[in-house]
Amino acid sequence: GFLSGSTGIEXIPGPQL
């Protein structure tokens, strides 16, 4: 997710860092 970058455990899409 947003914390881990890209898609992660948060279950939602996040920014590619």
UniProtKB/Swiss-Prot annotation:
Q: Where in the cell is it found?
A: Plastid, Chloroplast thylakoid lumen
Q: Which UniProt keywords apply?
A: Chloroplast, Plastid, Thylakoid
Q: Specify whether Chloroplast is a keyword of the entry.
A: yes
Q: Name a GO CC annotation attached to this entry.
A: chloroplast thylakoid lumen
UniProt keyword Chloroplast present: yes
Instruction: State the source organism's domain of life.
Output: Eukaryota
* Annotated protein name in UniProt: Thylakoid lumenal 9 kDa protein
- The organism named in the record is Spinacia oleracea
